[in-house]
């Protein structure tokens, strides 16, 4: 019901005559829910603004497959690169996928974990959110055969000819499956397996470079680049930083 001017004036006078404690009790009694809803809306707004202000833009997406790195090495591979490139660490990041495990050994005790890692890699590749992968030989072979990897010789020749002259002799060739009839064999539509492969220079062994000599890796670790990466300029500068 709408109050008259006289009633409004009476309420104002009564409110002014209250003690501070009575005023607080009156406000909480009649305006508790509007106040709570207003505070909730303000908290949501502040949270959104804070998230936008502190959100970091990924410069690169990097995965570690069958490879564990310590905190110091991880820092060198992420914030070290950003600092060397003159990028603001508060606004940029190298996003990492850690603890990925790939194997084609169906008898391994970690088969379910390997399957989950394979799905995670597939999702990241399909989303365009995986650029560089550090991996051991087994992971390198699997990624190469699946056709995930970019030819590094071509990448370097196109984007950094000077580094190409130095690094191309060090690149490792691996098989890439062009076609196979394993499904047809499984369905009894073909009698013999027929797999067609070609070789590509899609791996760079890292143990000989200063940054990795004291890394303590168990065996050789290879740098590989995902074929559908859209950040090839950043990938090239990253390789130049790692192998400098």
Task: Please tell me what each predicted stretch does.
Residues 9-22:
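Short, membrane-interfacial amphipathic segments enriched in basic
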Residues 30-52:
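Hydrophobic membrane-insertion alpha-helices, especially the h-region
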Residues 58-68, 93-97:
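Short, well-ordered beta-strand elements
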Residues 62-82:
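Short extracytoplasmic/periplasmic juxtamembrane "stem" segments immediately C-terminal to an N-terminal membrane anchor
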Residues 211-231:
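A bilobed periplasmic-binding-protein/Venus flytrap-type ligand-binding module shared by bacterial periplasmic
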Residues 230-241:
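Short amphipathic alpha-helical coupling segments at ligand-binding clamshell hinges
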């Amino acid at each position: 019901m709408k109050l008259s001017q006289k009633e409004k004036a009476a309420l104002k006078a009564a409110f002014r005559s209250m003690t501070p404690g009575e005023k607080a009790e009156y406000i909480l009694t009649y305006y508790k829910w509007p106040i709570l809803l207003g505070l909730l809306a303000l908290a949501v707004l502040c949270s959104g603004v804070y998230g936008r202000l502190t959100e970091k833009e990924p410069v690169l997406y990097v995965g570690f497959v069958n490879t564990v790195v310590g905190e110091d090495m991880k820092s060198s591979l992420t914030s070290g690169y950003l600092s060397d490139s003159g990028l603001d660490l508060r606004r940029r990041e190298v996003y990492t996928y850690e603890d990925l495990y790939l194997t084609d050994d169906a008898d391994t005790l970690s088969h379910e974990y390997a399957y989950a890692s394979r799905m995670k890699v597939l999702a990241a590749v399909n989303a365009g959110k995986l650029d560089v992968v550090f991996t051991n030989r087994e992971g390198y072979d699997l990624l190469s055969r699946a056709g995930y990897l970019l030819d590094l010789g071509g990448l370097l020749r196109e984007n950094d000819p000077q580094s190409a002259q130095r690094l191309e002799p060090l690149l490792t060739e691996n098989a890439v499956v062009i076609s196979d009839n394993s499904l047809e064999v499984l369905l009894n539509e073909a009698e013999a397996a027929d797999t067609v492969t070609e070789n590509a220079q899609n791996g760079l062994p890292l143990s000989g470079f200063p940054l990795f000599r004291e890394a303590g890796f168990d065996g050789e670790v290879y740098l590989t680049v995902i074929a559908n990466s859209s950040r090839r300029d950043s990938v090239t500068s990253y390789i130049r930083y790692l192998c400098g």
